[in-house]
Amino acid sequence: MAAGAAACPEAEELEADFENTENNNNTNRIFMKKGTVIAIAVVALIAIWSVAAYNGLVSKEENVKKAWSQVENQYQRRSDLIPNLVATVKGYASHESQTLQEVTEARASATRITVDTDNLTPEAMLAYQDAQGQVGAALGRLLMIQESYPELKANQNFLELQTQLEGTENRISVERKRFNEEAQIYNTSLRRFPQNIIAGITGFVPKPYFESNDGSDQAPTVEF
């Protein structure tokens, strides 16, 4: 009996140790489960944030592309006016051949320069802006011819074309400004943390701006 009684405390101690071990294991499993849940939640949040940041950059870049399309549309509108304008001036000032040729050649050169909105580099922007500037300067010289030709100045078709040209120049200015605004919004997003990380990984690059000018690339307004 004494031996059996002595064994009981040892058995109870072993049982207590076993229970403590089980409790510790259960606690560890709970912590592991919590840690796993937290890790999954963190990964999910990062994934959601990454997708949102990427989609935001895509949206802003699309706005830049849309703004660029409007710029091109207005420059194309101006280009479409040139043949009729040249033909009208030629009817009254045919010997102004050099000026007429300059306008025609500037238009042809500008038409050959296209810009890929997916690769809108500063070099491409500069080449495009320079070509359009040459057109504007040539048109300015062409319009000044009317001062020497009263009949041309009074021609109704010429007056209508000049009105359309002036309206187009105004729209060009508006769309250029809008493009710069959209490009600035996009470029600012690229520099901000943490979008700059997503931009670096996914290949988003800054967009160039239209440079401000003194109006030398625009056809002047001539008072009648």
Describe each region flagged by the PLM:
Residues 17-22, 26-224:
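A helix-centric hydrophobic-segment signal that preferentially recognizes long
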